[in-house]
Amino acid sequence: MSADSVNSGSAVREPDPYRVSRRSLRVRWRLLPWWVKVTLVYLAARVLTTIMVIEVARQQGPNSWTGAKPGYLDFASLWDARWYEIIGIGGYPRELPLADDGHVAENAWAFLPLYPGATEAATLLGLPWKLAAVIVAVTAGYGAALVLHRLMLRFLEPDRALFAVVLFSIAPVSPIMQFGYAESLGFLWVALALLLLVDRRYGWLVPVVLAWAFTRPGALAFALTLGLHFVWRWWHRDRDPFPPREQLVVIGVGLFTVLAGFAWPLIVWGVTGQVDGYTETELAWRSAYIGRQELVPLTPWFQGGAWWATWVGLPAWVGIAAVGVLAVGFAAMLFLPAVRRLGVDIRFWLASYGLYLFAVFFPQSSTFRILAPLFPIVGALAVPRARWYRWSIVLLLIALQYWWLAGVWRVDDYDWTPP
C-alpha cells in the first residue's frame, strides 16, 4: 500500500483557527489570578451601569436638585447623597429640627458618619465632593466584591464563586455602588465580618464591627448572628471542639457588637439632649406614609402591608396577609439546598438581618436598597451551571437594574419616595 493511499485513507482535519482562538481565550481566562477576574467583572459591571445611568439621566427633568438632563456626578448625587454632603461639609445639628406638627423632622442624624468622613478626607486631595463621594463608593464596592469572592470560595467551586460576584455586581440596586451613598462601604463590612466569622477569626471582628456601626445600620443584626453562631458551636462541641477560651472571645465580641450597635443612638442623645432623638429622626421618614406613629417592634411590616394594599385599592387585610406569606417564604428559603450550601453562618446572617428588618423597618420606596445587605444570597443563585439559566438571570438582573434607575432613582415631578 502506498503512502498516498494511507494518507488519503486517514485524512487529517485541518485545525479550525476560530475554535483554537476560542479555546485560547478560555485558557487565558482560567489562568488569570482570581483577583484579576474579579476586577474585570466588577469594572465591566460598572461600565454597563454607567451607560444606563447616562441614558436615564438624559430622561431626567428639572427637579429640586438638578436641572434637566444632569451630568453623571449630579445625577449620582440625588436623594440621600445630599444629606451625606451636608454632613461632610457642616456636620450634625446640635438641636433636632421640628416639623410643623411639633415632631422631629427629617435631619442629618439619620445618616452615620464614616462614609461622609471618608469622602471629606478624599476632598483634601483636591477632589470636588461629588467626585470624591463616587470614588469612595466605587472603591468600597470593589473591596466588597473581592471579599465576597473569598467568602464564596469557602463553600462553592471557583466558577460558581466568580458567578456570585457577577450577580452581586449587576444586582438591581448595584448602581448604588457608584452613587454618593454609604451602601458599598456597608457591603464591605458585611462581607468582611462574615468571612472572619466563617474563618473563626473572632478578634478581628472588633474593628470591622466598629466601622460597620458607624457606616450603615445592621450591627445589631450581626450581634444576633454571633449569638446564633455561639449556640450552634456549643451544641455541636462534641464533633467540633469549642474551647472555653473561644467561647469567652465570642461572648466578648458579641457584647461589643451590641454596644457598637447602640452607640449612635447614644451619641445622638448626648449631643442633642433628646433620649429618643435617633428613633424620632428615623420615624420622620415613614410619617409621609402613615403619619407620626410610635415604633412598636414587629408591627411596621404589617402597617406597611395595610398601607400599600389600601394605596392600590385593595382591602388592608390583603396586604397584611401578603406580609405573612412573605415572612413564611423567606424562612422557607433558608432551607433550600442551594442556600444550605452556603453554610450555617451565612444563613444565620440572612435570618438575623431579615428578622431585624421585620422588627423595625417600615417597607417603603427604599425597601430594595435596605434589603441589599442580604447580598450573600447570590451564592445560592450562582449554584446552577446551565448556560440558559446563567444568561437568563444576568439579563433579568440587568433589566431590573435599568428599571430601578428609571423607576426609583430618577426624580419624577414632586417625588417623595427616596430610593
Predicted regions and their residues:
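Signature aromatic-anchored transmembrane alpha helix within multi-pass, membrane-resident enzymes
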Residues: 255-258, 386-413, 417
